[in-house]
Amino acid sequence: VKHRYLGNSGFKVSELTYGNWLTHARQVDNKEAIKTVKAALESGITSFDTADAYANLEAEPILGQALKNERRSGIEIFSKVFWPVADKKPNDHGLSRKHIMESIDGSLSRLGTDYLDLYQAHRYDHETPLEETMQAFADIVRAGKALYIGVSEWTAEQINAGAKLAKELKFQLISNQPQYSMLWRVIEGEVIPASKKNGMTQIVWSPLAQGVLTGKYLPGTAAPEDSRASNTEAAAGGIAKYMSDEALTAIQKLKPLAESL
């Protein structure tokens, strides 16, 4: 697995990143989850992406357990903040200073690490002044709790505003994590140009449209047993919109091209 720089920084990540959104503590038991992390490491993947909201606080500890014996300087750990978790108290969501500061301490504890390589705003918070959010991120970087800051699913306008404030606060936004695949290309019009303008690169989620682009789902045929599409909870995560016979028929036309590469 090759490595490349993330954004306009000296920080390198593996081209393929291991994410545990719909797997750890949900679709895969803990032993199998740890095995998959070990397999990723053996294949050369060094970057691992999670979030406090994944499996409602339960995904981070599993990833932390799987990585606990790894040399910390040889891996890159990403997490995120925004969504409510646990008991969902009034301040337990969004990008307020209170929630960001408490959330990163929780993530560090669950992951068993002293710092995150990348801490990401999981969404944009329309209820908190952006200045408050960016100041909190700046303080986290200065405290050494996170080395770099990124965002997820921000619009071009939000990226421009956030990057400007970050620069004023003497740090930088280096990444955006949007949904992006051959079946979902909405970021190409404005988000990618805004990201490039601000020295940010994409860490895309669902690049295979949650497995649909693997070609294993066939039109007029039931989803394979134990696949994501056969799991009711997973289907609610977004795969259902790609499972029409029309879409699956079109995807099958890509197989000869894929096999020729």
What kind of region is each of these model predictions?
Residues 1-75, 114, 142:
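N-terminal binding-site loop/beta-alpha segment at the start of enzyme catalytic domains
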Residues 6, 18, 33, 40, ...:
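Conserved, mostly hydrophobic/aromatic
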Residues 14-15, 72-75, 79, 114-118, ...:
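Short acidic capping loops at alpha-helix termini that bridge into adjacent secondary structure
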Residues 20, 50-52, 79-81, 123, ...:
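A cross-domain feature marking catalytic cores of carbohydrate-active enzymes
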Residues 22, 84-90, 213:
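A short acidic, helix-capping loop that chelates divalent metal ions and anchors anionic groups
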Residues 27-40, 94-111, 130-135, 159-163:
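Short, acidic/polar
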Residues 87-120, 179, 183:
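Active-site gating/metal-coordination segments in enzymes
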Residues 128-261:
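Beta/alpha (TIM)-barrel catalytic core signal, keyed to glycine-rich beta->alpha loops juxtaposed to Asp/Glu
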